[in-house]
Regions:
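A short, surface-exposed loop/turn module that caps and links secondary-structure elements
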Residues: 34-59
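Enriched for short, Lys/Arg-rich terminal
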Residues: 1-10, 18-22, 26-29, 44, ...
Length: 90
């Protein structure tokens, strides 16, 4: 999917920053770099729409998953959770 050349607004839940502080620095820096690029195109990368969730997506990032909501009308991305990959986080 493509969007217009206008970038999206990015909002990051404070809990995400807490999660980043608890994981190895190299992983946290890589995840933060991915999050910072999301306003260019939130549909880019290894993403999957979450079943049963209207606007929730997850992006695979190494051993972690970034969960976020896309509000297309407002052109807003809300990153609300980062979790290590498990059988429950795909």
């Amino acid at each position: 999917m493509m969007n217009s050349s206008e970038s999206w607004d990015l909002q990051v839940d404070p809990d995400v920053f807490g999660a980043l502080r608890r994981i190895p620095r190299r992983d946290a820096e890589a995840l933060l770099a991915i999050i910072q690029l999301m306003p260019i195109d939130p549909y880019f990368g290894d993403i999957k729409k979450m079943k049963g969730e209207e606007s929730t997506w997850r992006r695979r990032a190494g051993a972690y998953r970034i969960f976020y909501k896309i509000r297309a009308v407002e052109k807003t991305i809300l990153v609300f959770r980062i979790e290590p990959r498990t059988s429950k986080t795909y």
